[in-house]
């Protein structure tokens, strides 16, 4: 695995989604969300095509809650609905009100459904993409109780997330659904309260490894930010004792360093992986106390 660092000098802090062209598929460009800020109501989505720029306006002002790209379909979660963009068409599926759609995920079960999950007025719930109920998947773990940033991934039918499964629970990284084994979670206070800044699965030899990225904050008078990447085996079987049987036994973290021209970048803002023929390249977007981003 390789981390590429490249300075970014022209970042403008505005309430928009910046979407970068990734590749051509079925006459539509697959889109890679380069950076996403917390946004006020957004009126349109901007897409880049081979023949120029095209604008797709929402019918009403919407606050963007989440965005996911699954099988060349862009899912955009808002309050009470999810928008899908595919084959140059923008569609809307209405769901319950006071329901912030934080998650769109491909569940690799027998039905291979795409689920959309939301807060559902403090009672997390999942639906199929057509808006019908999904009785097979609980909402807990798939969506938070209140609108907040989440990290959730699915690999070979196994679902992992940093979403609390109880209202007052401690933030943890969990494997909680699928054929990889029983539920596992990190120890107390390993995951920061604001959650992760990326997660992905990559093969290391014959084993599938899970990687997560986050920034830890230590100190009370003098605050210090420490960026980490951690790994664990996807098929981890837990610890040997009754107290550790549901803890990750292969969890290992290492500090990331990003020092350029004498300046240290210590806070992870966003991360993204790009797979090549021979490797997986990890891009990490760092920030510094001076608010000068770096990639």
From Swiss-Prot:
Gene3D superfamilies in the record: YVTN repeat-like/Quinoprotein amine dehydrogenase
Any one Gene Ontology cellular component term annotated for this protein: plasma membrane
Domain Sema: 1-295
Cysteine-cysteine disulfides: none
GO biological process: integrin-mediated signaling pathway; positive regulation of cell migration; regulation of inflammatory response; semaphorin-plexin signaling pathway
GO MF annotation terms: chemorepellent activity; integrin binding; semaphorin receptor binding
Family, similarity comment: Belongs to the semaphorin family.
PANTHER family (UniProt xref): SEMAPHORIN, SEMAPHORIN-7A
Further comment: In the Western Reserve strain (WR), the A39R protein is intracellular and not secreted as observed in other vaccinia strains such as Copenhagen strain (COP). The WR equivalent of the semaphorin-like protein is split into two ORFs which are likely to be truncated and non-functional. This ORF would be the N-terminal part.
Name this polypeptide is given: Semaphorin-like protein A39
Organism: Vaccinia virus (strain Western Reserve)
